[in-house]
Regions:
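Intrinsically disordered, low-complexity, repeat-rich regions
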Residues: 1-121, 129-135, 142-193
């Protein structure tokens, strides 16, 4: 039994060291754009991520089946969205927003989902929208309990950096039910303005 405990402790320690190394590398290579060996975290308009009609592999068990009919979702089905709840409310607001032409419930797998690099691999925001003015909006909804989580903060930093490198063609929104004294609809208005 002593060997099992030692092996478990070593496994936990190695995992912690791996996470620390990932965070350090991410900070150096991704979140420090001025350094000589930093990665470029900006949209590649020469090879953009394209949502192709008919290419949205939403597993049958994860498809939205609620009563609300989304009018602007790019695909006829939605994946990973439960009827009711905070993300559902966010999706409804995106769907009804006058600045949104089309939107997608982003898949959390490549190559069909849009992702950005993080210390733990890739981050797939909740929603991607094409706006009526031609800009691309990448939107991430967070529950209040996650707003101060270090990994979630890293995602926000990466998304913000990505949008800043877009020459105004893309925006990144970090949304919550209440944030900085604004409700969800108000936050969405500010982000999409």
């Amino acid at each position: 039994q002593g060997r099992c405990k030692l092996a478990q402790d070593m496994e936990v320690r190695v995992a912690d060291m791996h996470d620390q190394a990932g965070k350090k590398s991410c900070t150096k290579l991704v979140l420090s754009p001025g350094s000589a060996d930093a990665w470029l975290v900006e949209p590649d308009w020469a090879q953009p991520h394209v949502f192709t009609p008919g290419r949205y592999p939403a597993p049958v068990g994860s498809r939205y089946s609620g009563r609300y009919q989304f009018a602007k979702h790019y695909f006829p089905v939605l994946a990973g969205l439960l009827d009711g709840g905070e993300e559902f409310a966010c999706a409804q607001l995106i769907d009804r927003h006058p600045a949104v032409r089309h939107w997608v419930r982003n898949l959390d797998t490549a190559p069909c989902g849009f992702g950005l690099p993080t210390s733990r691999g890739r981050f797939f925001a909740d929603f991607v929208a094409e706006l009526v003015d031609g800009r691309v909006a990448v939107l991430e909804y967070k529950g209040a309990h996650l707003l101060n989580n270090p990994y979630e903060i890293e995602k926000r930093q990466v998304g913000t950096l990505w949008a800043q490198g877009s020459q105004g063609r893309a925006i990144f929104g970090w949304l919550a039910m209440q944030r900085d004294g604004l409700g969800l609809a108000q936050q969405l208005d500010v982000v999409l303005a």
